[in-house]
Amino acid sequence: DEAQFKECYDTCHKECSDKGNGFTFCEMKCDTDCSVKDVKEKLENYKPKN
């Protein structure tokens, strides 16, 4: 969901920047991390419950 992604991205980007990493590095890292997290959560929801 878009709001969750934005929250994940904003938090990640701030933490990444605070560590002294560059904007583009953080943008790519956080975009990937948060996209993967989003996909993972969706997959968890689709798994059949045994």
Swiss-Prot record:
InterPro entries: Pollen_allergen_ole-e-6, Pollen_allergen_ole-e-6_sf. GO terms for molecular function: IgG binding. Signal peptide: none annotated. Disulfide bonds join C8-C34, C12-C30, C16-C26. Expressed in pollen. Gene3D superfamilies: Pollen allergen ole e 6 (1.10.287.720). Keywords: Allergen, Disulfide bond. PANTHER family: MAJOR POLLEN ALLERGEN OLE E 6-LIKE (PTHR35632:SF1). This is Major pollen allergen Ole e 6.
